[in-house]
C-alpha cells in the first residue's frame, strides 16, 4: 500500500486556504495536470460532487465523500487510468498562528494487472511532488 502524506503551513486564513484547495481548478497548479474541474452532471461542491482530472499519462474521476468547510474534505478515486485501488484522500485544515496548517493524506494500491508495486514506485514520487506543488501554488497565491 502506498501512503502519501504532505503538510504545509500557509500564511492565510483557513477559509481562504480551504476554498482555494477545494476548487478542482487548483489541481492545475501541479506540473503534470492539464485540466481539472467538476463534471457536467456533478452536484454542487460538497459531498457527492464529482471532479475529473486529466494529466500527462493519467486521468482520474473522483468523488467528494465528505466536506466540512473549512475543516476538511475527503475524496475517493472512482475510476482512473492507470487503475488505482484508492482508499481515499483527506485534506485537513487547522488554524496555526496567523495561517493555516494543511495536512494531505492519501492511500492507494495499483492492481497487479496494471503493474502493482512497480507502478506504485513510479506514481508515489510523481503524485507526492504534484501535491507539494499544489500546496506551494496555494501559498504563493494567498500568502500576505
Model-derived segments and spans:
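A conserved amphipathic terminal alpha-helix motif
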Residues: 108-144
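Hydrophobic pocket/interface hotspot
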Residues: 17-21, 27, 51, 64, ...
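Glycine-rich portal/gate segments that line the openings of hydrophobic small-molecule binding cavities
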Residues: 37-82, 96, 133-144
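Glycine-rich nucleotide-binding loop
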Residues: 97-101
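Hydrophobic/aromatic beta-strand elements that line small-molecule binding cavities or substrate pockets
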Residues: 6-8, 61-66, 87-95, 106
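Hydrophobic ligand-binding cavity/cleft-lining segments
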Residues: 1-43
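Hydrophobic beta-strand positions in extracellular immunoglobulin-like domains
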Residues: 10, 79, 106-108
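Short, cysteine-centered beta-strand-loop-beta hairpins and adjacent loop/turn segments enriched
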Residues: 56, 81-85, 110-114
Amino acid at each position: 500500500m502506498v501512503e502519501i502524506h504532505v503538510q504545509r503551513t500557509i500564511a492565510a486564513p483557513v477559509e481562504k486556504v480551504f476554498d482555494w484547495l477545494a476548487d478542482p481548478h487548483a489541481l492545475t497548479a501541479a506540473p503534470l495536470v492539464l485540466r481539472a474541474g467538476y463534471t457536467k452532471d456533478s452536484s454542487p461542491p460538497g459531498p457527492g460532487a464529482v471532479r475529473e482530472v486529466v494529466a500527462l499519462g493519467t486521468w482520474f474521476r473522483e468523488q467528494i465523500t465528505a466536506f466540512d468547510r473549512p475543516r476538511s474534505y475527503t475524496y475517493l478515486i472512482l475510476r482512473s487510468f492507470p487503475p488505482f485501488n484508492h482508499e481515499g484522500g483527506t485534506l485537513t485544515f487547522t488554524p496555526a498562528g496567523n495561517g493555516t496548517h494543511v495536512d494531505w493524506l492519501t492511500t492507494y494500491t495499483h492492481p497487479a494487472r496494471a503493474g502493482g508495486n512497480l507502478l506504485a514506485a513510479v506514481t508515489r514520487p510523481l503524485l507526492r511532488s504534484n501535491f507539494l506543488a499544489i500546496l506551494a501554488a496555494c501559498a504563493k497565491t494567498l500568502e500576505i
